[in-house]
Amino acid sequence: MFSNHLLSLAIWLPIAAGLLVLATGCDRRAPLARILAFVGALAGFLVTLPLFTQFDRLSGGFQFAEFYAWIPALNINYALGVDGISVLFVILNAFITLMVVLAGWEVIQKKVAQYMAAFLIMSGLINGAFAARDAMLFYIFFEGMLIPLYLIIGVWGGPRRVYASVKLFLYTLMGSLLMLVALVYLSFQTGGSFAIEDFQNIKQIPLFTQQILFAAFFLSFAVKVPMFPVHTWLPDAHVEAPTGGSMVLAAITLKLGAYGFLRFILPILPDASRYFAPAIIVLSLIAVIYIGMVALAQTDMKKLVAYSSISHMGFVTLGMFLFTNQVQLQPWALKGAIMQMISHGFVSAAMFFCIGVMYDRLHSRNIADYGGVVTVMPKFAAFMMLFAMANAGLPATSGFVGEFMVIMGAVNYNLCVGALAALTLILGAAYTLWMYKRVIFGAVTNPHVAEMKDINRREFAILAILAATVLGMGLWPEPFIAVVHQAANDLIAHVAQSKI
């Protein structure tokens, strides 16, 4: 019965759970709100698991499809489906939401119900964006998830939370308005349809028109990634966001922008993608190298990891726009970009949670305030070492898989581009291990550090689960690659066809 509606359950179950949690009201019922939020997040994650176990890895196209006429007068439909690209993001989102609920279990003491509800509702909206097969449905979910994210940062964030949340909202909203115009134009070209498949199957779009549409989509998605130079909102948002907000922001919401490239720009506008590919490659390399060096200069742990996220996402966009002979996408690079997004979801969430664990004890993100943490928190130090190594792209961790595949594609594309891309391994090791060394090792010079207690059972469980995912994907990436393989090959074949 439920197997035909798994995607609807993945969307509406977290939203319904969020509304139920919200109904618990005041903080006197905070224990009940936490339990309901955990049950809702766990149920939301469990309903996504059949999407992975029952997914046909040899079949292309959308699976678990659902279709209902929604607004017939405008030809807008409730159409859902996942392919090998989007299915992993739906599962990742549900998993990270469960981790976020556990992460805020004891830390959040005020407006607990509202906090938990915001994350659950946002999780459902994000799943809707990843599963939508109707462009207007995608747009509604894509924009709708900004509201709970805005509230999470604006209500539970740091001293400059209002500035950070408004900046995030304005950056993302301005780009999205242009995307709406592009969607309406494409609908006219299909005779009124908003189906994403119909957009992708438009036979002829002049190059100049493709370039205009590319600019409209690109601004919207590039801000979300975020790409250089429209990245400045992200460090502010991360610094001010609560730990759970940073976990979701880095692990999930950034992926929506990159997903937009895969779902809209590349298949709908292949000629414009080839035309602008050299510029995208340059911007991506700037993000990888320059932003990596900016991360080296940071003294705030959250800012350092925020800049490292921009650098890693630069690696993702690089892998998406490597065309062989200006015709065909590099298969290894494209699949590596998707693997990098999944890995970054695990690793970035873990890194921000580690910073949150230390902040809860010392109430400081300044690297200079720490030192010698391993002497008082040995279990925590061991976990953080694993995540630091994964962030640096160490083999046998998930961080290595996608980076290695993208570098393979980059070297095949151009040796110089491959060499520049490989610098991310050096820079990643430099800024991550520099932070780890100064925070974890050395003598205890701050008396407050000496009073810090090692991780409790809740924190240990979260870190152990995240560690298992990082090591599992690093040691056995084949199940992830197998899911992506056919959808990526279909996208490559589609993009190779000119629409001029």
Could you tell me what each predicted segment is?
Residues 18-23, 49, 98-102, 124-128, ...:
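Alpha-helical transmembrane segments of multipass membrane proteins
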Residues 1-6, 20-117, 193, 197-200, ...:
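Transmembrane helix-loop-helix hairpins at membrane boundaries of multipass inner-membrane proteins
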Residues 8-24, 38-51, 92-104, 122-124, ...:
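Central hydrophobic cores of alpha-helical transmembrane segments in multi-pass inner-membrane proteins
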Residues 27-32, 117-121, 125-209, 294-364:
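Alpha-helical multi-pass transmembrane bundles of energy-transducing inner-membrane proteins
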Residues 228, 348-352, 418-451:
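Predominantly late transmembrane helices and immediately cytosolic-facing juxtamembrane segments
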